[in-house]
């Protein structure tokens, strides 16, 4: 959506880059246009850099009660800061919001909800677990339809469009608003095959029956897209789109595998915003 540009009164009409699925010449990856994946740490579409990185999760607390402050501060890999935060926790009465670096809402809940702290702890775990990446494989990823600006409503569906400049093996890891983790791809042996360079790849698949259906929990999902130069054996232990928690056996398999990645790896993160539909209890006809 163009509301982001319009709301900021851009003085000159920008030339919007084509979506991956509509860009067979990969114009969007042309460094002349300024779209190379620079080493930034957060945002709707981000890339990990090969340089040393700070994996600490920096959290700012606004009007937070002492018990909640203590619970957040006790999480491994979390540092409480006054500025330059990765996450902000804002408490008002019994309500609390978890916000991203640009003030975008990740989840809104009651202050006694343990899932709030679980979400913070899970993102800190992801920060520590992800390997340092580079642009060696030319990874580019986004949601499709791209006109939605990574924002979808309950019962809508979408896919991730991925393009590579070099052949690679893909993995998508979802962190949902409640702190749950899911390996979205690969979920079966047929998906652990090399993806060719050049052509756009729809993940999980181009068939509408394979598209991702938006359901609860709603908020902001942080989806990490990884491209590996070589096949990674640990992915065979993660069959099925099973939701898991930090500290589970599945999380241990993933952390151990990512700690011993062989070959080049590229990493990008896409934040997907989802909202409940008015009066909808299910996505049935």
Model feature map: region roles:
Residues 2-285:
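Secretory-pathway glycoprotein ectodomains that are cysteine- and/or Ser/Thr/Pro-rich
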